[in-house]
Amino acid sequence: MRFQSNGRLKSASIETYLLEKVRLIAPGAGERNYHIFYELLAGLPQRERKDFCLGNARGPQDFHILAVSGTFDRRDGVEDRKTYQDLRTALTTIGFSGDETKELFSVCCALLQCSNLSFVESSSGASEIDTSNPALRSALKLLGVSAEDFGKSLCCSAIEARGEILYKTLSRAQATKALEALMKATYSALFQKIVNRINLSIAKADEKCDNTGDLSIGVLDIFGFESFDANSFEQLCINFCNEALQQQFNQYVFKQEQAEYQQEGIEWRFISFPDNQDVLDLIEKKHEGILSILDEQNLIPQCTDQSFARAMYEKCADHPRFSVNSSQKILGNFCIEHYAGIVEYSTVTFLEKNKDELPKETTELLKSSSIDFIASLGAILATSRSPSPNGKKHSALRRTNSSLVRESVGSQFSGQLRKLRGKIEQTAPHYIRCLKPNDLLVPGSFSPAIIADQLRCAGVLEAIRVSRVGFPQRYPHSEFARRYQMLARKHIPKHKRYYSEKDLCEIVVNAIALLIRNAPSNAVHDR
């Protein structure tokens, strides 16, 4: 948020980090997919359901990406029908017209239908879309593409050779992966389109690009430290972010503490404070860190999750924060000792999630749509860009014969995090820790153990320990003088209004020190 010199809000913008696209395809057990799908199924009027090919749908259980987790209702008891109305109001507020809102909903419903598609395999191993599946017709209608183009984009891979385009048929497993890539890319582009529209609605129309001299406030909302029964690439990125911001929090607390002591002229030797730089090096150090090893493996044509795991075990074996036992090696797992505790990760799908390959056919398919809104999503994917480490813009895409290979997700995330930390270092940050009172998401229930664990993970308990070792009681001079001057009445000047509050405090402290030195030990105890 940017403000004028008089404090008036000038404009605002939002930025996203690490969209969890894997949730769209495979939400975890006990977790829901993105709320939008449930809200549409619960809230769309009957007259509109037919337009979105939902006329015969009973509910979330009819669509694979919603049924796979077995969880349909929100744990907090909020009704999807009500939040659907809130959603429509929000879309209108940020500038979506009625037609655009329908097109947005149409894309979401297309993803539901795509999740129900299936493939058949011929005797030669070539795949084809199962045309007997009723979801196919609905998906084609909602996406505005032809059956021929749709089938070719999912079941074939285009190869350019000497100016000629050849098509290679894909296996059923490869076609399924292509469908998942199409769904994730479409959802990602839709998400980015909404973000772009929000930024357009909250930016000042005549705002210049140069905001030098603006007063600004940034609000960073991030996931807390994560440790589940199964932890994957997303948890590594989230915990990497938390490690980096925790280090910044530690340094800021020390810096602020030291500045205050120096300002007051207080001599105090700082106690040791856990430094997690070694964890950050383990994750991001060039050529040696886990993300760097992952990027190197992604460049090897025949790499697998197993080959990545072996390379990581070899390079990280001696790192004090890295551990792996024989049974974990069999599974491709490893452990990192984070500042908040030890977390075990599985390397399964690490390569795929980090590579984030976008089949060239996907962008071409969306761009060929007869529906302008969906064609615009293809354009967003084709022109996707990311910031380079030096702050300049460069294309985040490089072409191969059959796909657009983005800068790896890990590299993009590291760059975003580096830029974010640079911004924070130029500000005066204020930290707000949000704590869950219980794991059941129910009101009126407070679990001290859960709260204590969150405070420990967030580094709050450690910060309190540092404060206690120093001078935890911090009275303003005026408050201290008012409260304790009665102990030094004989020493307080009659015309004390001519003395500063700090001078009065010194008089009180010196008088009490003299009183303690001159009094018998038992008298001091009695006082």
Predicted regions and their residues:
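Extended, low-complexity interaction tracts enriched in P/G/S/Q
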Residues: 1-28, 33-42, 140-141, 149, ...
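Folded alpha-helical bundle/alpha-solenoid domain cores of large eukaryotic adaptor/scaffold proteins
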Residues: 89-144, 166
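Short basic/glycine-enriched coil/helix segment immediately N-terminal to the Walker B
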Residues: 103, 208-215
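Short alpha-helix boundary/capping elements
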Residues: 45, 109-116, 147, 227, ...
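Alpha-helix capping and helix-loop boundary segments enriched in small/acidic/polar residues
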Residues: 75-78, 127, 236
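Microtubule-binding structural modules
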Residues: 1-87, 118-120
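Generic alpha-helical segment signature
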Residues: 30, 80, 101, 129-132, ...
